[in-house]
């Protein structure tokens, strides 16, 4: 069996080694460890500004998630490759457990405040049942919104690239100048897709931090 072309037996051999061997604080850090710590600190400062200090324990996992999403998004821009994050099933598999973890953590640590979000302060008494239903639905729709947003943005960009590249290929024999203009548009759109891949990975992770 394979996962994205990588044999699972290879992953099973390498992963325990990565978990077992950690850098010691008594030894001087190498360049790789220093770079990893710098990346973690930089991203943590950006992502966790609205989060209190106890929430910073999520930093390593969410940064790993963002790097994973960025890698998967960029993978689809290579020729003859498939973008895993254009599949709603994969995005939901990432969004739903993490969203559920934030909800359960909030209910465990601050149950009153978590349940208080279902009823905004100052709500008129007749509207209380309706607002509780609306806030509950909006709470449960969050993972779906995360997954659909990522899927829709990446799929739309890839479809545009496919259509414009097909148009350039068709116009090349008969209308070379029009094909050249189409290729220029294709290059600009590819640059835009690179930016979208980065932004979507950041937004996915940022929204999860806001749910904390």
Swiss-Prot record:
Molecular-function GO term, any one: proton-transporting ATP synthase activity, rotational mechanism
Q: Does the keyword Mitochondrion apply?
A: yes
Q: Which GO terms describe its cellular component?
A: mitochondrial inner membrane; proton-transporting ATP synthase complex
Keyword vocabulary terms for this entry: ATP synthesis, CF(0), Hydrogen ion transport, Ion transport, Membrane, Mitochondrion, Mitochondrion inner membrane, Transmembrane, Transmembrane helix, Transport
Q: Which NCBIfam families match?
A: ATP_synt_6_or_A
UniProt family annotation: Belongs to the ATPase A chain family.
- Protein name as catalogued: ATP synthase F(0) complex subunit a
């Amino acid at each position: 069996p394979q996962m994205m072309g990588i044999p699972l037996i290879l992953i099973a051999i390498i992963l325990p080694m990565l978990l077992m061997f950690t850098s010691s604080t008594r030894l001087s850090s190498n360049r790789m460890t220093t770079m990893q710590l710098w990346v973690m600190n930089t991203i943590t400062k950006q992502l966790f500004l609205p989060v209190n200090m106890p929430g910073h324990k999520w930093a390593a996992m969410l940064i790993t998630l963002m790097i994973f999403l960025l890698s998967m998004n960029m993978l689809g821009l290579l020729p003859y490759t498939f973008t895993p994050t254009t599949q709603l099933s994969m995005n939901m598999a990432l969004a739903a457990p993490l969203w559920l973890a934030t909800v359960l953590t909030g209910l465990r640590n601050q149950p009153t405040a978590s349940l208080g979000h279902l009823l905004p302060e100052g709500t008129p008494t007749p509207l209380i049942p309706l607002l509780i239903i609306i806030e509950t639905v909006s709470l449960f729709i969050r993972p779906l919104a995360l997954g659909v947003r990522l899927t829709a943005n990446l799929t739309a960009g890839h479809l545009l690239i496919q259509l414009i590249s097909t148009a350039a290929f068709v116009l090349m024999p008969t209308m070379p100048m029009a094909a050249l203009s189409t290729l220029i548009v294709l290059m600009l759109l590819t640059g835009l897709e690179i930016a979208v891949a980065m932004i979507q990975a950041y937004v996915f992770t940022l929204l999860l931090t806001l749910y904390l």
